[in-house]
Amino acid sequence: MNKNEHFKSGFVAVVGRPNVGKSTLINALIGDKIAIVSDKAQTTRNRIICVYTDESKQIVFMDTPGVHKPKHKLGEFMVDAAIESLKETEAVLFVVAGNEKRGPGDNFIIEQLKRVKVPVFLVVNKIDTLKKEELLEAIVSYQDAYPFAGVIPISAKDKENLSEILKVLEETLPEGPQYFPEDMITDQPERLIISDIVREKILLATRDEIPHAIAVDVDEMKTRDDGTTYIRATIYCERDSHKGIIIGTKGALLTQLGAEARADIQKRLATKVYLDLWVKVKKDWRNKSGMLSELGYRK
């Protein structure tokens, strides 16, 4: 595809506090659902590579877990993954929620950014909720703390001003090779994408005490003789009470979660899917390094 002798390419880290819209932004830029989205903080756990390619450029976005003060080994893993990504980029997008005051979490990230030697752009998200003077106040607050290479106000939800991000990055990135085929949009293994789809449905359906105490592992995936893709997945939680909530009265919630996840998986695989979900209790799994490794969490 790359016939442009001035083709631009490079890696761009997308960082920010939990729940500021990083994954929504990535999905909107790529035009596909790669990173799962919910209104719960710390939805993204792994660093996810998402690739945008057109005739003049290839931008490799690294969607990172939200930076927060870790409370367990999983939290430490998530923060390490986010900070590590800053060392491997040609540019950084620091995403903030324009409708929230700059806080300790933002200040922690800014301290990390001070060690970065590449251009850092402030992306002010959720401008659809702001008046002009509120937006200006938010921008000034962050500019007082760090010398950003530029400021890009956007609404990831409404896909407003996203083209400006692509334009600015094309101007910033160096001339370089096309690292990935033009039809590749992520480095995520198929099984991990499927497990994230199931986890997303749980995040959206359950109350606050459950989301970060659950993980999903795809145990088996095979094509049956009739062409149906059979997927067996286990949902791990830390308490018996969580297991009861996920299953629901007479299995109602688990059935609902399965139906919603199956619909999304079928769209991605473009085939009929039989999704077989199981729920198991693994006490304190978030503090067990071996379990985290088995579940695919990697730096």
Tell me what each language-model feature is.
Residues M1-A91, I235:
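Conserved G1/Walker A P-loop phosphate-binding module
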Residues D32, V51-E55, P70, S85, ...:
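Conserved, well-folded catalytic cores of nucleic-acid-processing
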Residues P119, D128-E190:
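Canonical P-loop GTPase G-domain recognition
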Residues E190-K299:
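P-loop NTP-binding site
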Residues T44, H68-K69, K101-R102, L130-K131, ...:
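Catalytic P-loop NTPase motifs of RecA-like helicase/translocase cores
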Residues G21, N161, L253:
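Conserved glycine(s) of the Walker
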Residues D63, N125, S155:
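Active-site glycine-centered loops adjacent to acidic/histidine catalytic or metal-binding residues
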Residues Y52-Q58, F77-V151, A205, K222-D225:
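Conserved C-terminal guanine-recognition region of P-loop GTPase G domains, centered on the G4
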